């Protein structure tokens, strides 16, 4: 089981309640998890960055939101999920 930060979980809830198609993904090499949204000709990849700890498990350390053709924004853990979701929707609706 992978532990994720509250902000990531809240963004996933917004996505699930939206009209957007999405795909969940995991990277078994480094423990990262994410969700990919593809809407028309635009895409957003939201990655929950993980850091390994001594017992071999991972802890969440931040979010990376990649906007296709519009750059990447990286956030430390503990941000505002509602604001992040509004940024994502604004990008997808432009």
Annotate each language-model stretch with its function.
Residues 1-39, 68-74:
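Negatively charged, low-complexity tracts enriched in Asp/Glu with abundant Ser/Thr
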Residues 9, 13-16, 82, 86-89, ...:
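Residue-level detector of alpha-helical secondary structure
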Residues 21, 52, 91-92:
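General N-terminal targeting signals
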Residues 42-83:
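Intrinsically disordered, low-complexity regulatory segments enriched in Ser/Thr/Pro
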């Amino acid at each position: 089981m992978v532990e994720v930060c509250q902000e990531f979980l809240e963004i996933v809830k917004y996505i699930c309640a939206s009209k957007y198609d999405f795909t969940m993904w995991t990277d078994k090499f480094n423990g990262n998890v994410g969700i990919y949204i593809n809407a028309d000709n635009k895409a957003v990849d939201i990655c929950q960055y993980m850091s390994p700890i001594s017992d071999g498990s991972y802890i969440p350390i931040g979010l990376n939101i990649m906007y296709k053709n519009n750059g990447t924004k990286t956030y430390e853990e503990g941000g505002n999920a509602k604001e992040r979701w509004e940024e994502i929707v604004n990008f997808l609706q432009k």
